[in-house]
Every structure is written in structure tokens, then in C-alpha cells.
Regions:
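Residues that cap or initiate secondary-structure elements
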Residues: 8-10, 22, 48-50, 68
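Short, acidic/hydrophobic/Gly-rich beta-strand patch recurrent on exposed beta strands
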Residues: 14-19
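Flexible glycine-rich surface loops and low-complexity tracts that mediate binding to linear polymers
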Residues: 37-51
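OB-fold/S1-family single-stranded nucleic acid-binding modules
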Residues: 50-68
Length: 68
């Protein structure tokens, strides 16, 4: 479980703050889930071969996502 958050840095991007304190930088967050404050349940895969300018959290590929 976590919350979608919009970060207004580096041109702006959406991330997910996990309830456990972890932060995630999804590379493929669906447009319909790009809503600041949206509670979500996510299954994701860590992308070890990817880089990001955001430097916000673990880079992940969303496998499954649902609003809560």
C-alpha cells in the first residue's frame, strides 16, 4: 500500500510513497493513476538496469496497480 505523490522538481514527476516509509520512482505509472494523494496497492519489479534524474527512490516497473 502507498500513496501517489507529485514532486515538482526536475520538471515534475509522480512517485509512490510506501506505507512502510519506502519511496518508489515508477517508470510506467499509468496516466489514470497520476493523481497526487491517490491511495494505491502496487505490485512492482525493481529495475536495477535503469537510471533516473529524480533521485527520489527505487526505480520500479509497475506490474499491477489498483486504487484503494
Amino acid at each position: 500500500m502507498g500513496t501517489v505523490v507529485y514532486k515538482d522538481i526536475e520538471g515534475g514527476f509522480y512517485a509512490i510513497d510506501g506505507d512502510n516509509g519506502s519511496r518508489y520512482d515508477p517508470i510506467n505509472l499509468p496516466e489514470s493513476f497520476r493523481k497526487d494523494g491517490l491511495r494505491v496497492k502496487v505490485t512492482a519489479r525493481r529495475k536495477m538496469d535503469a537510471m533516473s534524474l529524480h533521485m527520489y527512490g527505487a526505480i520500479v516497473e509497475v506490474v499491477n496497480i489498483a486504487a484503494q
